[in-house]
């Protein structure tokens, strides 16, 4: 009996390797957020570019800063869909808290609640990297910085996102005064000076990071509330 060889079969009848479409649950839409806290204020910045994870730009007008209360904002980079889901959850819980207690949640309490929320989702986490910035009950400016599963730290400056490695050295040098041989004594820096520095920082990140650009939102949080400003970055 003649044996049929595989090589004798028509090309269409040969068994082809089975390929599976890989499901990617997450995409990093890029962008940069940063914040600097002063004695009685916080300055937060975030660009408005949303990329598709590659070289495409999906929109140039996506704000990464979300106001939580009159004394607190959330700045987020990462996946836009998860960012929106997280914002909705926080907004719902803050509204419920205010209705039940008759007052808005304090900034430190919001920071802890966000940590709990992210940790609760740790087995399928929100692909978001967050900064909570605002003033506390004593009127002092603070920032809380997070990883994706809720580990957080209270600091005076921080950044997140695709331009993080470009911005952090500037913040280390100019805010914390690291790697300087001669450091002046502690002195209060005006909010206007910090705003100018933050603008320069995110502009610098936009020149080197293709996922950061178009426009930047600058937000100042102080005892009088939340104040917004927008300025243009590179558009290419």
Curated annotation (Swiss-Prot):
- Subunit organization: The 26S proteasome consists of a 20S proteasome core and two 19S regulatory subunits. The 20S proteasome core is composed of 28 subunits that are arranged in four stacked rings, resulting in a barrel-shaped structure. The two end rings are each formed by seven alpha subunits, and the two central rings are each formed by seven beta subunits. The catalytic chamber with the active sites is on the inside of the barrel.
Identify the domain of life: Eukaryota
**Function of the protein:** Non-catalytic component of the proteasome, a multicatalytic proteinase complex which is characterized by its ability to cleave peptides with Arg, Phe, Tyr, Leu, and Glu adjacent to the leaving group at neutral or slightly basic pH. The proteasome has an ATP-dependent proteolytic activity.
Q: Read off the InterPro entries from this record.
A: Ntn_hydrolases_N, Proteasome_bsu_CS, Proteasome_sua/b, Proteasome_suB-type
* Gene that this polypeptide is encoded by: psmB1
Q: Which GO terms describe its biological process?
A: proteasomal protein catabolic process; proteasome-mediated ubiquitin-dependent protein catabolic process
Q: Where in the cell is it found?
A: Cytoplasm; Nucleus
Q: What is this protein called?
A: Proteasome subunit beta type-1
């Amino acid at each position: 009996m003649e044996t049929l060889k595989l090589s004798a079969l028509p090309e269409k009848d040969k068994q082809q390797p089975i390929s599976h479409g890989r499901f990617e649950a997450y995409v990093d839409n890029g962008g940069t957020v940063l914040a600097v806290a002063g004695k009685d204020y916080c300055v937060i910045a975030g660009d408005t570019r949303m990329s598709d994870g590659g070289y495409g730009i999906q929109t140039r007008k996506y704000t990464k800063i979300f106001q939580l209360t009159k004394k607190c904002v959330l700045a987020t980079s990462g996946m836009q869909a998860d960012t929106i889901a997280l914002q909705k959850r926080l907004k719902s819980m803050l509204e419920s808290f205010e209705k039940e207690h008759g007052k808005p949640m304090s900034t430190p309490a919001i920071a802890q609640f966000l940590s709990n929320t992210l940790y609760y989702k740790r087995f399928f986490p929100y692909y978001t990297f967050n900064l909570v910035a605002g003033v506390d009950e004593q009127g002092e400016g603070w920032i809380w910085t997070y990883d994706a599963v809720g580990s957080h730290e209270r600091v005076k400056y921080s950044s997140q996102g695709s331009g993080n490695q470009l911005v952090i050295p500037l913040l280390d040098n100019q805010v914390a005064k690291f790697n300087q041989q001669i450091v002046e004594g502690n002195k209060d820096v005006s909010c206007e000076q910090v705003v100018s520095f933050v603008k320069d920082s995110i502009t610098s990140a936009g020149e080197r990071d293709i996922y950061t650009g178009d426009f930047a939102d600058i937000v100042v949080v102080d005892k009088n509330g939340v104040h917004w400003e927008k300025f243009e970055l590179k558009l290419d």
